[in-house]
From Swiss-Prot:
One MF annotation (Gene Ontology) recorded for this entry: hydrolase activity, acting on carbon-nitrogen (but not peptide) bonds, in linear amides
UniProt xrefs under Gene3D superfamilies: Isochorismatase-like
Function: Hydrolyzes ureidoacrylate to form aminoacrylate and carbamate. The carbamate hydrolyzes spontaneously, thereby releasing one of the nitrogen atoms of the pyrimidine ring as ammonia and one of its carbon atoms as CO2.
Family note: Belongs to the isochorismatase family. RutB subfamily.
Alphabetical list of PANTHER family matching this protein: ISOCHORISMATASE-LIKE DOMAIN-CONTAINING PROTEIN (PTHR43540:SF6), PEROXYUREIDOACRYLATE/UREIDOACRYLATE AMIDOHYDROLASE-RELATED (PTHR43540)
Domain of life from the UniProt record: Bacteria
Active-site residues, as the UniProt record annotates them: 24 (proton acceptor), 133, 166 (nucleophile)
Catalysis performed (reactions): (Z)-3-ureidoacrylate + H2O + H(+) = (Z)-3-aminoacrylate + NH4(+) + CO2; (Z)-3-ureidoacrylate + H2O = (Z)-3-aminoacrylate + carbamate + H(+); (Z)-2-methylureidoacrylate + H2O + H(+) = (Z)-2-methylaminoacrylate + NH4(+) + CO2
Broad EC category: hydrolase
GO biological process, one term: uracil catabolic process
The EC number(s) this enzyme carries: 3.5.1.110
Organism of origin: Enterobacter cloacae subsp. cloacae (strain ATCC 13047 / DSM 30054 / NBRC 13535 / NCTC 10005 / WDCM 00083 / NCDC 279-56)
Name of protein: Ureidoacrylate amidohydrolase RutB
Length: 229
């Protein structure tokens, strides 16, 4: 068993019965010229997040954890996004941006396009699972729950973008399904001002899960004394 230093208290889990979830590390959310950037959100601080996720993924993989990569988006005709009868049509900033700028139609979060692709630095490997998702939560209209339950996985460690949107939404839904959720705060980034990150982390550690960081996560999976030995 592994004990991870976290807030509000440490949490113990079995690495082989846990999953590291990488949420939406796509050009859309982490690269200049991607959807968030074009919609007016600041993506200038995402590079350290990418490096921290690389570190967390390597540690998790070495410890035998399942790695799950999410990609948020829809078909290039946006049928999966829902029409005016869906609240997603009205609240998705990607869809709103394309309505304001018709020249972007078919480019933002469209499967097969650059915006939808994972950033170059993060590459899934054999044995990882890559899941498309059509809404903020990774549990909505995806096989995530059955994939986890069939493997006996109950603990989920979250990284990715955006902390206050898709990361928090997926962790919250997991909480309602009896999963233990941990977020690595320095391997996430918010959409919006810094207070959005702080509020999301407050919600998670107070009501829905635990908050840790990449260094403590790596040390828990591979303690320094074990590395020296």
């Amino acid at each position: 068993m592994t004990t991870l230093n976290a807030r509000p208290e440490a949490i113990t889990f079995s690495a082989p019965q846990s999953a590291l979830i990488v949420v939406d590390m796509q050009n859309a959310y982490a690269s200049p010229g991607g959807y968030l950037d074009l919609a007016g959100f600041d993506v200038s601080a995402t590079r350290p997040v990418i490096e921290n996720i690389k570190t967390a993924v390597a540690a998790a993989r070495a410890a035998g954890m399942l790695i799950i990569w999410f990609q948020n988006g829809w078909d290039d005709q946006y049928v999966e996004a829902g029409g005016p009868g869906s609240p997603n049509f009205h609240k998705s900033n990607a869809l709103k941006t394309m309505r304001k700028r018709p020249e972007l139609q078919g480019k933002l979060l469209a499967k097969g396009g650059w915006d939808y692709q994972l950033v170059d630095e993060l590459v899934p490997e054999a044995g990882d699972i890559v899941l498309p998702k059509p809404r903020y939560s990774g549990f909505f209209n995806t096989p995530l729950d059955s994939l986890l339950r069939s493997r006996g996985i109950r603990h989920l460690v979250f990284t990715g973008i955006a902390t206050n949107v898709c990361v928090e939404s997926t962790l919250r839904d997991g909480f309602f399904l009896e999963y233990f959720g941990v977020v690595l705060e320095d391997a996430t980034h918010q959409a919006g001002p810094e207070f959005a990150q702080k509020a999301a982390l407050f919600n998670i550690e107070t009501f829905f899960g635990w908050v840790s960081n990449v260094a403590d996560f790596c040390d828990a999976l591979n303690p320094p004394l074990a590395r020296i030995a």
